[in-house]
């Protein structure tokens, strides 16, 4: 296969910007004659023009981490400096695409090379220059208007789900001297021309942004709207907000990937950026296979989920260094859509692999290792990544709000949560969904351990719940109490058996079992249970807690009388009711609809109350 006809880099070809390779150690290359280079500057190494980034400067020597396989690079090979940092292209064409860690479009490379492998040093622009997009300028913008960074000056309907708002890059401003009329343009055509202090500047629909730099915002806002995931255990007990940070640590086979994929499929976000960094390739191929087939209903129209998703896939034949780049590429894409006023969710699967890449690079640079060989700055790197989440007031006009929610999967070796990456992550994130190996072995999925998980957003969401689901907060508190009590009783039951427990404790055990098996457990592969809307979650919990309260009251009020009501009597008389309670989850929100499900649950509550009345009479 002849790769020589593929495009090469076109940035700068001046002889003065060349250095020379001095030494090669895996993905780390040292180069000399690099005086005047900057930290994190993008370079091209060797005759194949491999992409690299400067990570250390000493005198005229530069240490470069290379994002491609370095075999064949020899001492004395040229190192071309590009004079700019590692950046991504932001513009129409991102949605539905799949990029590698340094934003090379994998499908375009595949069609150009006719090969399943990525050739080294390939240089394909991230956003296709051949596709024409229909550009509509903003109504209130004309020649002579003043415009500043972040202002929306046009709209491109990227697909039926995403209106791509074309914004002025944050650092530019000026007076409009030309704006393109409505029509079809490709991403290299000039659609806007500004004049500022006598200097004219032309803009296309694409802006370039350095990945390590946070995109500016007007102000950060407190997050107060829940990120509804469709998973009952997460929405009810450990909610996350739009603009929050979440960690999902869990051992191999606990279901981290299924949770992050179901978040991508069913959460109430407008845009999903899914970063697979260093995980197994079959997980990314599963995403690629499933997502185009998955649909969601928007205003009565069925749409493919891929239309609101961009994938950043670190292919397995890329060296470890690229894992770091893929995390930054993903978060920069997320911030760009946030600036348009969208609510974005970014899934990073898995941040442990990224930390391992940091460890390897740090080892090759001979830095002092800290805990488990990870570098001492691991916590700071993780924090700088998670801090880019949040709900914000976006820069520019018209006024708009956007948010970035980060969900990071962590894979501690052997499921050990005291691992440095897990403990550093838990110090930063606000929501912790801890997955339990024992639950996974019992086939209880999602295997979120309700005793060790927590969410620090409970208070922030109280206002939302009071407004929309007034009865929910006390229900959640009661459910947590029941689950905690059941855990305390489990030890006693093992010693003395169930029979010798108090009647109220027997009720607690049975209702806890009901909550665990028929509320917290959820089968992600069935049409009725793969996604649970919040009204259904509240309805189910409400009926279970109502049964618990009525059963306890019946037992306590008749404890002193002659015809005592015990748990065995309740169970005998209410087999039908218990069966109905445990089969509440089989209502299909798509087929049955909200009104019918709510009516059925209300009817069941009435049946429960009537059954207890007749029992007491």
Curated annotation (Swiss-Prot):
V-ATPase is a heteromultimeric enzyme made up of two complexes: the ATP-hydrolytic V1 complex and the proton translocation V0 complex. The V1 complex consists of three catalytic AB heterodimers that form a heterohexamer, three peripheral stalks each consisting of EG heterodimers, one central rotor including subunits D and F, and the regulatory subunits C and H. The proton translocation complex V0 consists of the proton transport subunit a, a ring of proteolipid subunits c9c'', rotary subunit d, subunits e and f, and the accessory subunits ATP6AP1/Ac45 and ATP6AP2/PRR. The modification Phosphothreonine is found at residue 136. This is V-type proton ATPase catalytic subunit A. GO terms for cellular component: clathrin-coated vesicle membrane; cytoplasm; cytosol; lysosome; plasma membrane; transport vesicle; vacuolar proton-transporting V-type ATPase, V1 domain. It comes from the Eukaryota. One of its GO terms (biological process) is cellular response to increased oxygen levels. One of its GO terms (molecular function) is ATP hydrolysis activity. It is a peripheral membrane protein. Catalytic subunit of the V1 complex of vacuolar(H+)-ATPase (V-ATPase), a multisubunit enzyme composed of a peripheral complex (V1) that hydrolyzes ATP and a membrane integral complex (V0) that translocates protons. V-ATPase is responsible for acidifying and maintaining the pH of intracellular compartments and in some cell types, is targeted to the plasma membrane, where it is responsible for acidifying the extracellular environment. The modification Phosphoserine is found at residue 384. Phosphorylation at Ser-384 by AMPK down-regulates its enzyme activity. The gene is ATP6V1A.
């Amino acid at each position: 296969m002849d790769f020589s006809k593929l495009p090469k880099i076109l940035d700068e070809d001046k002889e003065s910007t060349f250095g020379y390779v001095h030494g090669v150690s895996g993905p780390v290359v040292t180069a000399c004659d690099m005086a005047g280079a900057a930290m994190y500057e993008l370079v091209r190494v060797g005759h194949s023009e491999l992409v690299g980034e400067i990570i250390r400067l000493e005198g005229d020597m530069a240490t470069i981490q290379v994002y491609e396989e370095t075999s064949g690079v020899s001492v004395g090979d040229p190192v071309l400096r590009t004079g700019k940092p590692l950046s991504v292209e932001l513009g129409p064409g991102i949605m539905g695409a799949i990029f590698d860690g340094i934003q090379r479009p994998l499908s375009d490379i595949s069609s150009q090379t006719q090969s399943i492998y990525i050739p080294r040093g390939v240089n394909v622009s991230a956003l296709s220059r051949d596709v024409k997009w229909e550009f509509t300028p903003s109504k209130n913008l004309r020649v002579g208007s003043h415009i500043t960074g972040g202002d929306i000056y046009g709209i491109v309907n990227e697909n039926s789900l995403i209106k791509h708002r074309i914004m002025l890059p944050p650092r530019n401003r000026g007076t409009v001297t030309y704006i393109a009329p409505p029509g079809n343009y490709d991403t290299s055509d000039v659609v806007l021309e500004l004049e500022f202090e006598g200097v004219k500047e032309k803009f296309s629909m694409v802006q370039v942004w350095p990945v390590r730099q946070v995109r500016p915002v007007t102000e950060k806002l407190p997050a107060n709207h829940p990120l509804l995931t469709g998973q009952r255990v997460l929405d009810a007990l450990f909610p996350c907000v739009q603009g929050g940070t979440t960690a999902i640590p869990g051992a191999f086979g606990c279901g981290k990937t299924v949770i992050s994929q179901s978040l991508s499929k069913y959460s109430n976000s407008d845009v999903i950026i899914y970063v697979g960094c260093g995980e197994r390739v079959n997980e990314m191929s599963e995403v690629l296979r499933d997502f185009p087939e998955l649909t969601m209903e928007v205003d009565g129209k069925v749409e493919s989920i891929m239309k609101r998703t961009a994938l950043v896939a670190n292919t397995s034949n890329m060296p470890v260094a690229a894992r770091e780049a893929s995390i930054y590429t993903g978060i920069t894409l997320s911030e760009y859509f946030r600036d348009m006023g969208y609510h974005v969710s970014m899934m990073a699967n898995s941040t442990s692999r990224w930390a391992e890449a940091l460890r390897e690079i740090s080892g090759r640079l001979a830095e002092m290792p800290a805990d488990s060989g990870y570098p001492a700055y691991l916590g700071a790197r993780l924090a700088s990544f998670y801090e880019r989440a949040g709900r914000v007031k976006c820069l520019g006009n018209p006024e708009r709000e956007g948010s970035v929610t980060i969900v990071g999967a962590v894979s501690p070796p052997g499921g050990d949560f005291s691992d440095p990456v897990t403990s550093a992550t838990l110090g930063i994130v606000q929501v912790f969904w801890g997955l339990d190996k024992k639950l996974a072995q019992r086939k209880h999925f999602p295997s979120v351990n309700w005793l060790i998980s927590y969410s620090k957003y409970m208070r922030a969401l109280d206002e939302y719940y009071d407004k929309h689901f007034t009865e929910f907060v006390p229900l959640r508190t009661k459910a947590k109490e029941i689950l905690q009590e059941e855990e305390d009783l489990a030890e006693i039951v093992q010693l003395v058996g169930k029979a010798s427990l108090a009647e109220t404790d027997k009720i607690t055990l049975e209702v806890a079992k009901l909550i665990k098996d028929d509320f917290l457990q959820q089968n992600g592969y069935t049409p009725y249970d793969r996604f649970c809307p919040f009204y259904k979650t509240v309805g189910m919990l409400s009926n279970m807690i109502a049964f618990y309260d009525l059963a306890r009251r019946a037992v306590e009020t008749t404890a002193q009388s002659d015809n005592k009501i015990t748990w065995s009597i309740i169970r005998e008389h209410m087999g039908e009711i218990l069966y109905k309670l445990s089969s509440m989850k089989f209502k299909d929100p798509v087929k049955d609809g909200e009104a019918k499900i709510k009516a059925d649950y209300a009817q069941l509550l009435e049946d429960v109350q009537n059954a207890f009345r007749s029992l007491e009479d």
